[in-house]
Design a protein with these regions (language model features):
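Active-site recognition of the HExxH zinc-binding catalytic motif
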Residues: 7, 143, 254-278
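Contiguous, non-catalytic segments that form substrate-binding/exosite surfaces or channel walls
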Residues: 104-254
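Secondary-structure transition/capping residues
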Residues: 18, 58, 119, 187, ...
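Short secondary-structure boundary segments
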Residues: 1-6, 10, 74-80, 206-213, ...
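A well-structured
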Residues: 1-160
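Short acidic-hydrophobic sequence patches enriched in Asp/Glu that either
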Residues: 39, 168, 259
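Conserved catalytic-core motifs characterized by acidic clusters
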Residues: 23-29, 223-244, 265-279
Length: 279
C-alpha cells in the first residue's frame, strides 16, 4: 500500500465520522425531540473526540510529513497540504477541550431555539458565555500574532486576520453609509406587500420545492426540510445535500428568499467533483 493510499484510509475514517456528526446536527435542527439534547451532546462529544484522536496521532503526522516530500498529483498535493494544516491546528488543542466545545455548542443550539421562540435572551445568555470562554481557551491553545480571533478566523479563512478585515469593513462602510442615506432620502416602497398575508406552510414548502427545481437543485441527491433558521448541510458527499428554510405564515418572502439562498449553497455542494469526496 502506497503512502497516499494509507492517507486515504485515514482521512476516509475522519470523513466518515464528520459525516455522522453532520447527520446528527441536521437531525437536531429538524426533528430531534427537545429532551434528547443531553444524549445528543454526549454523542457529538464522543465523535468529535475520535476525529481529534485520528487527526493528532503521531503516525498520521509522520505520514503527512512523508507525503509532503513526495511527487504527487495536483489534487493529491492540495489534499495533503490542507489536511496537514488542519492537523497542525488540531494538535495544539486538547482533546478534552474539543469534547467540551462539542457538548456546549450542541446544548446551546437547543437553548437558542427556545430563547428565540419565547423572545427571551436570558435563556441563551449563559450558554453563549460558556461557548465564548471555551473559544477563548481554543484561541490561546492555537496561538496568534495580534488578536485572539485570528486563531479562530483562519479555520475558515486561511491567512486572513482581524486587522485586515477591520480595514476592509471600514472601506465598505465609507461607501455604503452614504449610499444608504441616499436610498432612505428617496422614501420607501413596500415591494414585499404581495408576499405578506396568511400562507399555509405546506403551500410555502411546495413553492420552495418548485423554485429549487427551477434553479437546478437535484432532489434525487438532496432534500428540503424546515428548521428554526435556514441552513445547508452536505452529509458526506455531493449526493446527500440537505437544505432547510423557516416558514412564517405572515411572510412568504422569508421562505422563498431562504430557498434561493440555500439553494445556491446546495448547487455548489452538488457540483463538487465526485472523485474528491472524502478527501
Amino acid at each position: 500500500m502506497s503512502d497516499f493510499e494509507k492517507y486515504l484510509e485515514k482521512i476516509n475514517a475522519v470523513h466518515g465520522l464528520i459525516s455522522a456528526l453532520g447527520l446528527l446536527n441536521w437531525d437536531q435542527e429538524t426533528m430531534m425531540p427537545s429532551k434528547a439534547v443531553l444524549c445528543r451532546s454526549r454523542c457529538n462529544a464522543v465523535l468529535s473526540g475520535l476525529v481529534h484522536e485520528i487527526m493528532t496521532s503521531p503516525d498520521f503526522g509522520e505520514l503527512l510529513e512523508r507525503l509532503s516530500d513526495q511527487e504527487l498529483s495536483f489534487d493529491q498535493t492540495v489534499a495533503v497540504r490542507e489536511t496537514k494544516r488542519d492537523r497542525d491546528r488540531a494538535v495544539k488543542v486538547p482533546r478534552k477541550l474539543v469534547e467540551e466545545l462539542a457538548m456546549a455548542t450542541t446544548a446551546a443550539n437547543q437553548t437558542w431555539v427556545q430563547a428565540r421562540r419565547e423572545n427571551n435572551w436570558s435563556l441563551f445568555a449563559p450558554d453563549l458565555q460558556k461557548i465564548v470562554e471555551l473559544r477563548k481557551q481554543q484561541a490561546e491553545a492555537i496561538g496568534y500574532d495580534e488578536e485572539p480571533y485570528d486563531a479562530l478566523l483562519t479555520e475558515y479563512e486561511p491567512g486572513e486576520s482581524t486587522s485586515n478585515l477591520v480595514e476592509q469593513f471600514s472601506s465598505l462602510r465609507d461607501k455604503l453609509v452614504p449610499l444608504l442615506d441616499k436610498i432612505r432620502a428617496k422614501g420607501s416602497v413596500d415591494y414585499d406587500k404581495l408576499l405578506q398575508g396568511n400562507f399555509e406552510p405546506a403551500l410555502q414548502q411546495t413553492m420552495c420545492i418548485n423554485l429549487l427545481e427551477c434553479i437546478g437543485f437535484d432532489f434525487s441527491g438532496g432534500r428540503l426540510d424546515s428548521s428554526a433558521h435556514p441552513f445547508t448541510a452536505e452529509i458526506g458527499c455531493n449526493t446527500d445535500v440537505r437544505l432547510t428554510v423557516a416558514y412564517h405564515r405572515d411572510n412568504l418572502g422569508a421562505a422563498l428568499y431562504a430557498a434561493i439562498h440555500e439553494g445556491g449553497h446546495g448547487l455548489y455542494e452538488q457540483g463538487l467533483p465526485s472523485e474528491l469526496m472524502g478527501t
